[in-house]
Amino acid sequence: MSEMQQTRNGSVALSKDVLVPSVQRIGRREIEITYLGTNSAGQATWIMWNADDPHLIGMLSQGKMGYHFEQRTSTGVMLHENISLSRVQRALGG
């Protein structure tokens, strides 16, 4: 799959095309997501940006038991560990 796309049931599928940004609508937000490759721990890693007003939303990596999402907020960083992709979507307001 060349882009992160919503499947028929509304869940999200992530692209693994390295450094190819795609825009995904999650809730009312347009989010640009780019696969960076694997991190030093060998985990697939994506970066998320606000597509309308360029600022960092967070980093997502795929762990052994779920996803790790480091979310930037107005009050600091929130770290969500070992969560499902649907939970990431809810954290983003979708």
Region locations from a protein language model:
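Charged, low-complexity intrinsically disordered segments
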Residues: 93-94
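A short, structured beta-strand/loop element
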Residues: 44-73
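A short, sequence-level motif marking secondary-structure junctions
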Residues: 35-39, 61-67, 83-90
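Negatively charged, low-complexity tracts enriched in Asp/Glu with abundant Ser/Thr
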Residues: 1-51
